[in-house]
Amino acid sequence: MNQTKYIFVTGGVTSSLGKGIIAASLAKLLQGRGYRTTIQKFDPYINVDPGTLNPYEHGECYVTDDGAETDLDLGHYERFLNVPTSQANNVTTGRVYLSVIEKERRGEFLGKTVQVVPHITNEIKDRMQLLGKSGDYDIVITEIGGTVGDIESLPYIESVRQLVWELGENNGIVIHLTLVPYLAAAGELKTKPTQHSVKTLMESGIKADILVCRTEHELSQELRQKLALFCNVKKEAVIQSIDASTIYEVPNLMLEEGLDVVALKKLDLPKKASPDLKNWNTFLKRLKSPKQTVNIGLVGKYVEMQDCYKSILEAFIHAGAANETKVNVISIHSEHINADNVEEKLGTLDGVLVAPGFGERGIEGKIEAVRYVRENNIPFFGICLGMQMSVIEYSRNILGYADANSTEMNEKTPHPVVNLMEEQKNITDKGGTMRLGAWKCDIKPNTLAHRIYGEKTISERHRHRYEYNNKYADELQKAGLKASGVNPDTGLVEIVELENHPFFIGVQYHPEYKSTVANPHPIFVNFVAAAVNAHKK
């Protein structure tokens, strides 16, 4: 293909309709037909990136290989497509404005008055085409965050309008995702919210090419005809997106509805072969027909909101399917764990994952959880802060340093077994300043980590400021907590493990970010397998 084609996905009526899942599902189908496809997300908030956002407000912050702190939708894109994303795949209003203001300060606008149109919209359009101009992709799908009609989204909607016009016929299309609610009192689906949403989009100068309708009930042919007539689309372009039991069913549902076929027709592209979803459907079959069930505790600080640990929960789905096992993830708030109730909270579980996080709140509960699973031979997996808690717990209860701590929690601790990284000590800005992105790790032979990975050197994604303090490495090693993975350049300990334990591993990095449907992460796969063994015993 000579020219990259563009698909824009907008949303109406309400937020959280699943634009990201629809975009990822369409991309999966187009990828399955042989088209090189990527997805990008444009977020209307003024933060430069979501790295400093409270997890309760935004859900997890997803990290790419190149160290970008991004929206959690990029995790969905990677999990569906099995292709890495980058900084270019996520743009925020804050980043756009920052770039334009920096250009103005450098004098790049030749003294002109800088305005939303054309300067902000031109910046948005340039970023929308950045991946397309790389030559790596046939089709670029762009998800516009927010809801049509929101004041924050207006510059993006205007940019889409201009870009579709500039690209010319068959080179750019708009998919509008909307809600068709069911009124139980009337016993029928109502199309009026969708009609008004499309009308709002048209007032901005954009005609939707395809309508994707989220619904709890089947759309009748009459209803589809009505939507087509009043929303000015062809009947074949009215796509039903009925509620599914798992997001991984959505590509098949969109295939049945013909979303990819309609999109290709609008873009004047050949259908090529039918999408190859053989491996995807094998995964789905394993997911829906498990042979056993395990209960794994997720000990964290933000467990009230599932999106805070989105990638971890999805990684358990991938690992569960790989083991033909249903993984029941039981959320346990670390603030609610203490020495008196830890057995009641964790005693019946088949495994415990101590989750990542920041700050002092709930720390003692995490440390108590690590102690209990270590002493009772329950499979343990610690990620980032969870790994650091295992080091603190071991230092306190095995080395006898009762006041061992991280300098994040206590700057004056006499035993800082977890310490601020040297390169972080003079940094004052919070945004984008952590140790971020993919870093190498050398794995020692004859260790649990080596059995899991089967490789000498791995690359994993990081997001942290604090690290294992190597001053205590010899003592911890002699006492049994092995450092089995180390960064080859800095000597930073990345993996710790216990030898005489069914499964005990802590990692400084975030393996959940690299788990996909096609490649479940090996630590999660082995952790679930260990939980299965524990359950059988």
From Swiss-Prot:
Entry annotated with the keyword Ligase: yes
List of residues binding L-glutamine: 56, 357, 385-388, 408, 465
BP term (GO), one: pyrimidine nucleobase biosynthetic process
Top-rank taxon, per record: Bacteria
Active-site residues per Swiss-Prot or TrEMBL entry: 384 (nucleophile), 510, 512
Reaction(s) catalysed (UniProt annotation): UTP + L-glutamine + ATP + H2O = CTP + L-glutamate + ADP + phosphate + 2 H(+); L-glutamine + H2O = L-glutamate + NH4(+); UTP + NH4(+) + ATP = CTP + ADP + phosphate + 2 H(+)
Domain Glutamine amidotransferase type-1: start-end pairs: 295-537
Location of region: Amidoligase domain: 1-269
Additional remarks: CTPSs have evolved a hybrid strategy for distinguishing between UTP and CTP. The overlapping regions of the product feedback inhibitory and substrate sites recognize a common feature in both compounds, the triphosphate moiety. To differentiate isosteric substrate and product pyrimidine rings, an additional pocket far from the expected kinase/ligase catalytic site, specifically recognizes the cytosine and ribose portions of the product inhibitor.
Name of the protein in question: CTP synthase
Annotated organism of origin: Flavobacterium johnsoniae (strain ATCC 17061 / DSM 2064 / JCM 8514 / BCRC 14874 / CCUG 350202 / NBRC 14942 / NCIMB 11054 / UW101) (Cytophaga johnsonae)
